[in-house]
Each structure stands twice: as C-alpha cells, then as structure tokens.
Design a protein with these regions (language model features):
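Hydrophobic/aromatic-lined pockets within catalytic cores
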Residues: 11, 23-24, 62, 66
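Non-heme Fe(II)/2-oxoglutarate
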Residues: 1-22
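Short, Φ-rich (hydrophobic/aromatic) sequence segments
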Residues: 3-7, 56-61, 125-126
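Catalytic core of Fe(II)/2-oxoglutarate
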Residues: 36, 48-52, 61-64, 68-128
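Acidic/His metal-coordination segments adjacent to aromatic residues that form catalytic metal sites
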Residues: 39
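Charged, often glycine-rich, active-site loop that binds/positions anionic groups
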Residues: 43-47
C-alpha cells in the first residue's frame, strides 16, 4: 500500500543520509508516519514538534490546491499578539516539504476553507 511505500522511502539509508546532510542533522532510524485527511474547518494549532523529533517530510496530495483553499503549513513565531507567519507551504500534488525540527520550529496547519479534502502523507524521524 502507499503508506508502506512512503515508510520504505523514508527509511531508505540513502535518503536519510541525503536529507540529513541537507538539513545538517543526523537522522535516526526511527520513523513515525501518518496519512492526513483534513476537511473544511480542520486545522492544527500552533506548535513545535518537540525535543524527540529531528526532521519532518510532508508530501502534498491535493490536485489543484490554491491558497484560497486554506490548509497551508505556516511557519512563524508566537507572540503576545498572536502567531506571526513568516512563510507558508501548500499541499500541492507531488510537492514535498522537508524541514528540521527543534523546540523552536513553530508551525501550524491553517484551517481548511474548502469542501475538498486536504490530503498529505507526513513522516517524522524521531529519537524515540
């Protein structure tokens, strides 16, 4: 199935070394994988992925997705006035997002604003 293939790809030693070199981090062998289907109104609150996570790889699976559909992964900084967004990534079909994770890598998945489902595969390299 597709999730098993995604896991095998992320577990590939060559890919781990390549992505680790790009990010400047050693990627552990342990993986946590999820398939996401978000519907209108669904979102993830602002959060860092935490101290046990090293890197995240997300694959967009949405054909024809636009900014007006919402559901962007937004990176930024929490402030007293709210979350200040620095950049956004949309889950376009075939687009991948790779980022190093730290206790300061604040991000959110913004609310989905369309009746189309927001689909993605995400994997995290974790130390435990």
């Amino acid at each position: 199935d597709e999730i098993a293939e995604w896991r095998a790809l992320m577990a590939s030693p060559i890919l781990q070394r390549l992505f680790g070199a790009v990010l400047g981090v050693d990627l552990p062998e342990r993986l946590f994988i999820n398939a996401w289907r978000l519907r209108a109104g669904d979102f993830f609150a602002v959060h860092p992925d935490g101290r046990l996570y090293r890197a995240t790889l997300t694959l967009g699976l949405c054909h024809g997705w636009t900014a007006s559909d919402g559901g962007a992964i937004a990176f930024g900084d929490p402030t007293a006035q709210g979350f200040v967004v620095r950049e956004r990534w949309l889950p376009h079909l075939g687009d991948a997002l790779l980022f190093a994770v730290s206790v300061d890598s604040w991000h959110t998945v913004e609310p989905v604003l369309t009746d189309k489902p927001r689909l993605s595969l995400t994997g995290w390299w974790t130390s435990r």
